[in-house]
From Swiss-Prot:
HAMAP family: Ribosomal_eL33. This is Large ribosomal subunit protein eL33. Coiled coil: none annotated. The keyword tRNA-binding applies. Component of the large ribosomal subunit. The ribosome is a large ribonucleoprotein complex responsible for the synthesis of proteins in the cell. Required for the proliferation and viability of hematopoietic cells. It comes from the Eukaryota. InterPro entries: Ribosomal_eL33, Ribosomal_eL33_CS, Ribosomal_eL33_sf, Transl_B-barrel_sf.
Amino acid sequence: MSGRLWSKAIFAGYKRGLRNQREHTALLKIEGVYARDETEFYLGKRCAYVYKAKNNTVTPGGKPNKTRVIWGKITRAHGNSGMVRAKFRSNLPAKAIGHRIRVMLYPSRI
């Protein structure tokens, strides 16, 4: 068996009001999810922003490489169109807006 163990999502921006932006909560658009009740499956799932940096970092049990990850968790639905809110260990950088986020299919709640 091969293939992805994660769903594709796009980082759409930060949670915000009309004038204030709250960077501690990210808004994600998950591919194939278009209604609020479809987001139920993804609540509590881990998500990851994978990116490459300039310098190598040591990875546990592997060679040093340029790949880095910011981990987060999907917390709740946002609106009625299948968007979700996620909190990351450190806030996502603004340059990540419009880029891919991996939504892992664990932990399972079924």
